[in-house]
Amino acid sequence: MRIVLIGAGNLATQLGKALRGVHHEVVQVYSRTKDHAQHLADLLNAGYTDSLDQLVPDAECYVFAVKDQVLPAVIKQVCGLYADGSSALFVHTAGSISFDVFPKETKYYGVLYPMQTFSKQRDVDFTDIPVFIEGNSDETSNKLEVLAHSFSKSVYRLSSADRRYLHLSAVWACNFVNHCYDVASEVLAPIGVPFEVMLPLIDETARKVHELSPREAQTGPAVRYDERVMNAQLALMKDHPMLQDIYRLLSQSIHENSRHADMPTCRHLDIST
């Protein structure tokens, strides 16, 4: 399939490599930053442009992998230029945006959402990445399914309404968790302990949920309702009231989700120190 890749960021970079790896032809890369477009195009042996009105007009698929904030405007402009009478697929890759962002005059449009965290500098194997698709018709969905199956063995059809919850779940499981890693790193820095000491703990925590439910795998002072430990740790964060608030709320949530009926609640946890 001849594909135009609109975007040159983290997802666009890794998706472009995956598509080329299974013998699709990425014919062109667009980015509003010309150097970014050229860099990715060089990796994919493709043409490049920083102007939407200079896209290849006869591609079979236009993949939008740009920031959510600009996606509607970019889609409107591209479809206005190229969609009328076209048999090409027009698809975006955003987890949180509905497929009806496409103009209705577009014949074939939808969503192809690979649920994974992506970075330009870290290559990933798309084979096991779940890909969620949605098309504006059965014909479109079938085309998207074939495209997705060309690089992933885990392809699911999911509506825009349900994909909102999938994306929310991913934010909890990935983005918030990574922020906690960052907080942990900041806690260690003043005492000169490298973040690498946390990696075995992080790895085992991730491995456990392959065998146990997250609730069964939960450990820590909030589960045990260990007020002494929790209040002592809150005291260590006395100069960081936002972190205290986060610690308190997470501890309350953990405890409420895991406690037995005969265990006390920790909603009165003292955080005044």
Language-model segment annotations:
Residues 1-54:
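NAD(P)+-binding Rossmann beta1-loop-alpha1 motif at the extreme N-terminus of oxidoreductases
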Residues 27-31, 89-94, 112, 131-133, ...:
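Short, hydrophobic beta-strand segments that form beta-sheet elements in well-ordered domains
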Residues 36-43, 123-168, 173-210:
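Internal alpha-helical scaffold of NAD(P)-dependent oxidoreductase catalytic cores
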Residues 42-123:
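Rossmann-like NAD(P)(H) cofactor-binding subdomain of soluble oxidoreductases
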Residues 259, 263-267, 271-273:
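Short polybasic linear motifs
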